[in-house]
Amino acid sequence: MLIIGIAGGSGSGKTTVVKAITEQLKGKVTIIPQDAYYKDLSHCTAQEKRDHNFDHPDSIDFELLCEQLQQLKEGKSVEQPIYSYVTCARSKDETVTVHPSEVIIVEGILIFTCEKAREQMDIKLFVDADDDDRLMRVISRDIIERGKTVD
């Protein structure tokens, strides 16, 4: 099993790189998005959720992510959380069953900030893009996918 880590700033093109690798390896890839491992904020007030810094490593449940990567390496399937940016919470009723595969791609803006996660990766890629291009992609994505406004 090969574990590839793909990191980069918001809107840098990580998803595009993941899609390109997946297309080349045709069905031999499992994708683990860092976004699924955001800590649940359902206990927080609306203001606390708005103020939460999703770009800080403490916002990620790296313990669970690393534990599940290890289980996949051992050939076991895992139940990946489902996180909603709209509610800032993990689904209490649903998970995604993730099965081991020849290649596992872990992608996200913060995945290289955790030493234990880095140690589990065989290949690490950092995706970079122009700041203005990234900003436009992030604004577009946040409005379309995450229910945010331009304000």
Residue ranges of predicted features:
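P-loop/Walker A phosphate-binding loop and immediately adjacent motor/lid segment at beta-alpha junctions
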Residues: 49-50, 66, 78-79, 86-90, ...
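Conserved lysine of the Walker
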Residues: 14
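Conserved nucleotide-sensing/catalytic segment adjacent to the nucleotide-binding pocket
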Residues: 30-33, 39-87
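ATP-dependent NMP and nucleoside kinases share a basic, alpha-helical "lid"
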Residues: 91-146
